[in-house]
Amino acid sequence: MEHTTSKLSRRHFLETTSLAAAAVTILPSKVIAGMGYVPPSDKLNIAGIGVGGMGFNNLTNMATENIVALCDVDWNYAERNSFRKWPNAPKYQDYRVMFDKQKDIDAVMIATPDHSHALPAMLAMRAGKHVYLQKPLTHSVYEARVLAETARRYGVATQMGNQGNSGEGIRRICEWIWAGTIGEITKVDAWTNRPIWPQGLERPAKEMRVPKTLNWDLFIGPAKFRPYNEVYTPWNWRGWWDFGTGALGDMACHILDPVFKALKLKYATAVEASSTPINTESPPNAEMVTYWFPQRDNLPKVAMPEVKVTWYDGGLMPERPTELKDGEPMGDWNGGVIFHGSKGKIMCGCYAANPTLLPTSEMETFKEPEKTIRRIPNAETNGHEQDWIRAAKESKDNRVEASSNFSYAGPLTEMVLMGVLAVRLEDLKKRLLWDGENMRFANMNHSEQIRVITSNKFEVVNGDPKFNTKYDTIPALASAEEWIRHNYRDGWEQI
């Protein structure tokens, strides 16, 4: 479908079509499209890239539209669900081939491993296609910046797959904080139960035969090539630096989302991290990351002072609030957030679920402030995907952007990934000063080195423990620059 746009406002459209209603019972969809948007009754042609896992769930929530193409590097994984659900959709392993061959695609859903997010999204947006992209938005800070800029340049509808952003919980938290309910917030604690996959791993020495249904070269994509081993895919890629971003990258776009939105954050000015032993291959098993954010513009009912945000994962937790009674859960099974204000505290679970004042007894007499944020229908089911579809059908001039469009999701992802960088650079043993505008650490120099574990062996010999830990020293600044802006391997276009 080709959709033309015009400068015709939505108000003028409604006025003119209302006047015409007496004489014309039904307007053809092509006429309505010519007035500046695609009628909700028209269906988008959506292609899926990465359809074997979370991508299947996303496509299922988009099944009100035409699913016209399916692309996955692992056809065995995709066959379990997406290929069976949409057997007539053309199937591909290489999204570049899909875009070359199939010209009827209006929009794409991308749910590949983190390192393969940016390139298909860029290719789609440059072709004028709307993009739904799983979290974190990208694998690097630079990629997140470029995707947000590209979405603005091409005027496409975008959405990151942090579905809690469409929920009621994040809206209530924002409205409470903006109304001054707990006063000025200077401290936030956030945590997750992740990782629930192996981390702290060493690269396997054994090379395995690549399954016939997997295109290993395409899985590697822009990352540095390595021999195939079953430990990497289809699920545990999150536990490898080259492909994923660990527990922080996986969950912070969900858990820190209400923090970022409610406190109107952008660039942190500093970050510091500590963790269990870290190596060159895999994120640590547990980590604590602290961000410092500068003062922001005050709101009508509350000031926005400097704030410290601390992240915990791998079993690490913040101190339990004294306001919680014995037996009352702290957050939920997946994690949670506690906002510390000058007049009280707010706690929620993962995805901003079930927000409450602390102590929870305060909710008995609490009067909710006015609802000022647009609500998303069916947010607890398919609302996040459907809100993107709605935005895609509106013209860029009249569009109400989806809730986690790239202009929001890009900076959120930059914040998250800057914390990932701090973990990888923690051997510097200092607070890192972040220059957000220029995507660089301001207090690093070329002489600094970081020591990382390359091998960590342990055995018991004659009842005594024997440790054999090997280290490597790498240049800190050069490594940080590569992690901020990747150099893709040959054959993959730089962005």
Show where each model-derived region lies:
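Predominantly a Rossmann-like dinucleotide-binding segment in NAD(P)-dependent oxidoreductases
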Residues: A33, G50, M54-N58, Y154-M160, ...
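N-terminal secretory signal peptides and thylakoid transit peptides that target proteins
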Residues: E2-A21
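N-terminal Rossmann-like dinucleotide-binding module
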Residues: L19-W86, G164-G167, V259
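Conserved SAM-binding strand-loop segment of SAM-dependent methyltransferases
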Residues: P90-D94
